[in-house]
Amino acid sequence: MWSGWWLWPLVAVCTADFFRDEAERIMRDSPVIDGHNDLPWQLLDMFNNRLQDERANLTTLAGTHTNIPKLRAGFVGGQFWSVYTPCDTQNKDAVRRTLEQMDVVHRMCRMYPETFLYVTSSAGIRQAFREGKVASLIGVEGGHSIDSSLGVLRALYQLGMRYLTLTHSCNTPWADNWLVDTGDSEPQSQGLSPFGQRVVKELNRLGVLIDLAHVSVATMKATLQLSRAPVIFSHSSAYSVCASRRNVPDDVLRLVKQTDSLVMVNFYNNYISCTNKANLSQVADHLDHIKEVAGARAVGFGGDFDGVPRVPEGLEDVSKYPDLIAELLRRNWTEAEVKGALADNLLRVFEAVEQASNLTQAPEEEPIPLDQLGGSCRTHYGYSSGASSLHRHWGLLLASLAPLVLCLSLL
């Protein structure tokens, strides 16, 4: 009975090759749409956005998780490029920095037209698939990029923003971030302020995906209950597998299922294993858990490549996606489930967001109250009349009367 023992390693190798071959076969027909990649930030950090610097050539770019050969090897067919500006730009130059990073994405697509197709719709993604190009979309990572302005939000939409992450790792005046749940930030909005609710409604009206990565649990729940369309978590994993507050807890996963929304799993080691080291199999554990709790329709990929310092063994860069798909097939995921995670789930959610939009509806116009705006370097134009300025004028009046009150008290 042991006469064939020497064949076992060969059988294992052949089985591994089978799953890898199957992964490539599936991905040729259904390439992956990744929800979050920070290559634009690397282009700023390494080259100050000088894309014509010979070192910035994306066909030979070194030292990053992402370049054109790696995208091709990984069967990446769609990418939300992250337009990110750090939290320390809030109330300073966040809007300018955001515009510059959007410009980088546009220029990158124009410089490599044989590889990238800039798109703003689900139909555009499908067109890129047909042309064998990487559908390139813009996701703005952090609500501080709109500077608490509905007008800025609409302008960013016109420039191509197709998802907005409501916060990064800092509160905005209208939404709370995930550090509230760790105790490292104080809650300001109890999820969403009234102005934050208007932001959600305006994103729905425009047909912009709402991204709940980085937000507090209260903000997750408030948005899932308010939004008229499904939402995404562009780069978040499962809290029950790794208890990082950047991940999505099971009660929220159940809301994701109820709203037909989407969790695109982040590959950062500390959100996968809760340690500095992780591996591909542990990423698959997160995908399994989300599928179990929220359903196969709720699963996607948001690797956070080039935005994190540590990625799992076996997922060293964007070229490794076929190995992750092979692992899911090894775990008895069906071809339909795999295709859903690769692209179909994101396309379904995006199409639902587009269908829920209503550009003929009047836009949200009520600005944020002046006393809720942060930062000292602001003018008050437009607040000189109406309720918002009334509180300010009363405050100035009371301040001017303070010396008189003090004098009277001394009489």
Curated annotation (Swiss-Prot):
Keyword Lipoprotein listed: yes
Chief place where the protein resides: membrane
Disulphide-bridged cysteine pairs: C87-C170, C242-C274
Reaction equations catalysed: an L-aminoacyl-L-amino acid + H2O = 2 an L-alpha-amino acid; leukotriene D4 + H2O = leukotriene E4 + glycine; a beta-lactam + H2O = a substituted beta-amino acid; L-cystine-bis-glycine + 2 H2O = L-cystine + 2 glycine
Positions of the propeptide removed during maturation: 386-411
EC assignment: 3.4.13.19, 3.5.2.6
Gene Ontology biological-process entries: antibiotic metabolic process; cellular response to calcium ion; cellular response to nitric oxide; glutathione catabolic process; glutathione metabolic process; homocysteine metabolic process; inflammatory response; lactam catabolic process
Cellular component annotations (GO), alphabetically ordered: apical part of cell; apical plasma membrane; cell junction; extracellular exosome; extracellular space; microvillus membrane; nucleoplasm; plasma membrane
Binding-site list for Zn(2+) 1: H36, D38, E141
Tissue expression summary: Expressed in lung and kidneys.
UniProt keyword list: Cell membrane, Cell projection, Dipeptidase, Disulfide bond, Glycoprotein, GPI-anchor, Hydrolase, Lipid metabolism, Lipoprotein, Membrane, Metal-binding, Metalloprotease, Protease, Signal, Zinc
Regulation: Inhibited by L-penicillamine. Beta-lactamase activity is inhibited by cilastatin.
Binding of Zn(2+) 2, residues: E141, H214, H235
Gene3D superfamilies, A to Z: Metal-dependent hydrolases
Induction notes from the record: Up-regulated in n colorectal cancers.
Presence of the UniProt keyword Glycoprotein in the record: yes
Outcome of substituting E141Q: Partial loss of activity
Cofactor note: Binds 2 Zn(2+) ion per monomer.
Transmembrane annotation, as ranges: none
Pfam families the UniProt entry points to: Peptidase_M19
Family to which the UniProt record says this protein belongs: Belongs to the metallo-dependent hydrolases superfamily. Peptidase M19 family.
Xref: PANTHER family: DIPEPTIDASE 1, MICROSOMAL DIPEPTIDASE
Assembly, per entry: Homodimer; disulfide-linked.
Task performed by this protein: Hydrolyzes a wide range of dipeptides including the conversion of leukotriene D4 to leukotriene E4. Hydrolyzes cystinyl-bis-glycine (cys-bis-gly) formed during glutathione degradation. Also possesses beta lactamase activity and can hydrolyze the beta-lactam antibiotic imipenem.
Name of the protein described by the UniProt record: Dipeptidase 1
Species for this entry: Homo sapiens (Human)
